[in-house]
Amino acid sequence: TKSIRVISAAAVEKANSGHPGMPMGMAEVGTVLFKNVLKVSNKQPDWINRDRFVLSAGHGSMLLYSLLHFNNFDISIDDIKQFRQLDSKTAGHPEVDTSLGIDITTGPLGQGFATGVGLALAESYLSEVLGKDIIDHYVYGIVSDGDLMEGISFEAAELAGVWKLGKLIYIFDDNNISIDGNVDKVSITNQKNKFESIGWHVLEVDGHNESEIVEAIDLSRKEKSKPSLIIAKSTIGKFAPNKQNTSSVHGAPLGSDEMEL
């Protein structure tokens, strides 16, 4: 997780643009997904029955690129040095390329959330048509406060509850920080109550405790008739000495002084 934090912050610093806070805050969640959970192959990244991963919070793209790099997908350290540069593999927001392990394009808030619901619906349909011996996989994703504020995500979430998409598991990066300050200044929504009211299975965990995250995902996989939302309490910019848990780490480089610390 330290390597993910360092490489994410360094890439944003080199580009002088980007969002280091979310990758640093979701390092444990990302590590658990790629180390313990996702059924994917770096040798056959576009395998039809792979698990899908949706980084709905696409502004935190360096989390995905660092995870793909450390798991031997076709994202090299030189590619990461080209973060946010024209024609690079590592765009500011992820752009779909299944050969690299990037399942969908994300960035506009809420869009990835809704697309993931579509992916889970497709899995459910194709599993019935083709059989579970051919299609039997999960859709996992990381969603942000900003995603959940968007109308498109709530509409899609309600459909997921109606359709009982038990193969859909989202992890909510609940850090209470936006680019403009604390989320609770603009939203008082109880996400647990909201999602439970529309047919979701909801759990709460410490977003920096890997064993809790693993256990929550295991429990969610056992809930066959409901989509799951795992609310991961996290600290944006975790381990940035002076900027963690502040809006300043959301959408700007840490700065040379902070990087040296």
Locations of regions flagged by a protein language model:
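Thiamine diphosphate
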Residues: 1-138
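Glycine-rich ThDP/TPP pyrophosphate-binding loop and its adjacent helix/strand module
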Residues: 42-43, 98, 102-261
